[in-house]
């Protein structure tokens, strides 16, 4: 090989160039190069260097596949000791220079162990090896970095999934709602639960690489990738519910199995309600009426409820049942009876209400042998029920018209707070239609004149009925007196002249309940009298809104505001002949006489003399004192219907 002499000539220039490379690339080789700089002066060793140089070329290819040797390079770098030149020389130093000369690989292995060569190769070719070592180290570092990142991602996902699984288990075990066990089951094993568990197992099997685990501890600090848990939204949905709609119901966090009709109340099976009411036994019967029965029940959780069971052949049926459920699902107010759940099983339709334990206004005001109700209690009940109706009319969207306001539909708790009940006859009136013509359903004695005659339905019809309730609280009388069948005056017509005198002269004699004596606040009495007079006006458009009634009863508004639109000096607005009306007065009187004779002339009265069954409920309870011959009737299309075993409301 003639090439041997040429290297002999070149060695002198080569030494300066390599040092520059070595210094630029890696500091460790540079440290080893200074001592050998003195050796290049001797040419004889150079041939040996040539012989040695080709052999290392063979280590080049073998050194590439195993990444382990580079690991050995890193430890020697920190060691400044003279032993360092020995370690770098064997594998890596010759990597860049030898790729061009592959023919000498065979001789490489035997020559590498030679101990004489280490000096010269380190001097002549340390710089190129440094470059190659850089290439190897960077590739390895990149690979390690990528592997570490992948491991981090997998491990964080596994940790998040494990936490999520634990949380889900805890939530499922913490579910406290007892009544509908079947619905709660689907939650735990529902679409969200099953998919999540499968997903967790799938991801858990993913991290099978063993070497990856070694880098696990360092990556843990970068736990910020918490954002990858978008899958958890399903459990959040389960916890909420509610919402629905009782956004009510934010207070009620129980599960929302009953989304069938679009609200977050609870569904019950017929068997559950049958067990709760002891088979709908007579002992648990709270009342009955034209549309069905009301039974008291106790849920497995111990909560008392009132179960309203609709009669199969009643006018309410499926259509009105679904309308009622849809309406009540949007209502939540302290002065309105709350719906707890419902049941639809075949032809069976049941509603589950909260149980209000202290009966109703009719029982406490007109019940036989009941103590006289104090004035402060009467005012409290009037104000509470007015707030409940105001909520229905003005705070619900669309507004809700009750259509059957009466004393037996105002339930009383032990604190004598009023709760308006029975939305079975309620209807929704959209803002686009100012009135809705429907079947006439209401209780005789409370019907607004325009409603009883034509079926025109507005929220002002409820205002009229509430005015009748106020007159009951003021006078202690019933809406209709069945004992005087041929007397034309109802409670409203009898009270009109007295309301006129009381509003002008402040004289409540003959109007206020004589059983109270004079134990009432005259200013509060004046406010209630003014409200009652305004509510029972013939003209529906001249009746105030329920929110105005609330403010007037609270004393937060002038009583003159109740007379908006009335001509000054026309005090006869309270009389039967005041001003122009939307409903002809003579026609009103004729209709009332006709309705009254139909109601009282077709009913037979018992003589038991005791107040029948204590409670009324949700508009379905038969209440009445037979000795006084009460006669309240459910009306439909002007036809009076008997309700059997009593009468579905107050009368007389």
Curated annotation (Swiss-Prot):
ATP binds at residues 286-294, 308. Residues 8-19, 26-112, 216-236 have a biased composition (Pro residues). Residues 1-139 are extracellular. Glycans are attached at residues 21, 50. The modification Phosphotyrosine is found at residues 353, 451. Signal peptide: none annotated. Pfam families: PK_Tyr_Ser-Thr (PF07714). GO terms for biological process: protein autophosphorylation; response to fungus; response to wounding. GO terms for molecular function: ATP binding; protein kinase activity; protein serine kinase activity; protein serine/threonine kinase activity. It catalyses: L-seryl-[protein] + ATP = O-phospho-L-seryl-[protein] + ADP + H(+); L-threonyl-[protein] + ATP = O-phospho-L-threonyl-[protein] + ADP + H(+). It is found in: Cell membrane. Residues 161-652 are cytoplasmic. Residues 280-559 form the Protein kinase domain. The modification Phosphothreonine is found at residues 269, 438, 443. The chain crosses the membrane at residues 140-160. Residues 1-137, 169-251, 605-652 are annotated as: Disordered. Keywords: ATP-binding, Cell membrane, Glycoprotein, Kinase, Membrane, Nucleotide-binding, Phosphoprotein, Serine/threonine-protein kinase, Transferase, Transmembrane, Transmembrane helix. The modification Phosphoserine is found at residues 408, 437. Its EC number is 2.7.11.1. InterPro entries: Kinase-like_dom_sf (IPR011009), PERK1-13-like (IPR047117), Prot_kinase_dom (IPR000719), Protein_kinase_ATP_BS (IPR017441), Ser-Thr/Tyr_kinase_cat_dom (IPR001245), Ser/Thr_kinase_AS (IPR008271). The active site is at 404 (proton acceptor). It is a single-pass membrane protein. Residues 113-137 have a biased composition (Low complexity). Mostly expressed in inflorescence bolt, flower buds and siliques, and, to a lower extent, in roots, seedlings and leaves. Belongs to the protein kinase superfamily. Ser/Thr protein kinase family. This is Proline-rich receptor-like protein kinase PERK1. The gene is PERK1.
